[in-house]
A protein has these predicted regions:
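Conserved beta-strand signature within the Rossmann-like core of class I S-adenosyl-L-methionine
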Residues: 136-144
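A short SAM/SAH-binding and catalytic strip from SAM-dependent methyltransferases
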Residues: 108-121
């Protein structure tokens, strides 16, 4: 039993971080990062900074990034990427649910990408994000979650118990926008669509709290002719629009 536990621990500590870094380095995720991450401004909290794949996409409007992640191996990779950039990065080796060592209303932008799926207590983590984010601040999220299509959602429910075990706690069936709004955030820009690949794993939910619609326009332009629809929610009017 000890050998089995050691193997699981080795996989989670050393192998899985490498798999995550490789899996998240592709054309589709890079396009999403390029459309959203440059919107970040000022003092940034990135929850689930992982291997630092967002770092090259931050603009010069960012003063500093506070990167939270419990994985020391992913953080080691991220530190190398941070050294190659010009933005100051303060790494916080902890879970997002824990009390963040940041003052209330001290952050201009919170960024979370493909991380809400795997945080054990996502509501508690979102409350921490809300605590540190300024009233006028922006929340930027790029996530995957529960599909609206019943046939796909059924498979997400079936696959998730095993998927969590091999994917570092990743849930395929979390309702991302519901989690965010339940934490008290007002989503002003929300898009939903499937990326290429198996649909239970690729239902994508990017969005933000803020009033800048440039990402919506840029994303629509970049996907023109792809045959995929991009839907957006204007939360101020509660209307779905296609951008």
């Amino acid at each position: 039993m000890q050998d089995g536990d050691d193997a699981v621990g080795f996989y989670a500590k050393y192998v899985l971080p490498r798999i995550i870094d490789l899996a998240m380095r592709n054309e589709e995720t890079a396009r999403l990062r390029a459309g959203w991450i440059p919107q970040a401004r000022g003092e940034v909290l990135e929850v689930g900074i992982g291997s630092g794949l967002n770092l090259p996409f931050y603009s010069s409007d960012v003063q500093r990034v506070h990167g939270v992640d419990p994985s020391l191996e992913l953080q080691r990779i991220a530190r190398k990427r941070a050294m190659a950039g010009l933005i100051e990065v303060d790494f916080l080796s902890q879970s997002a649910e824990e009390q963040l060592p940041l003052a209330d209303a001290s952050i201009d932008t919170v960024v979370i990408t493909w991380a809400l799926c795997s945080i054990p207590n996502a509501p508690r983590a979102l409350q921490q994000m809300k605590r540190v984010l300024k009233e006028s601040g922006r929340l930027i999220f790029l996530e995957h979650g529960r599909a609206p299509d019943p046939g796909i959602a059924v498979w997400q429910d079936r696959i998730t118990p095993l998927w969590k075990r091999i994917g570092g706690g990743c849930h395929l069936n979390r309702k991302i926008d519901d989690l965010i709004t339940a934490a008290g955030f007002r989503i002003t820009d929300l898009k939903t669509y499937y990326l290429p690949g198996p649909r239970p794993m690729t239902y994508t939910v990017p969005g933000s709290r803020g009033d800048d619609w440039s990402a919506c326009r840029d994303l629509a332009a970049s996907m023109s002719g792809s045959g995929r629809s991009v839907s957006s929610l204007n939360a101020s009017t509660n209307d779905w629009v296609h951008c």
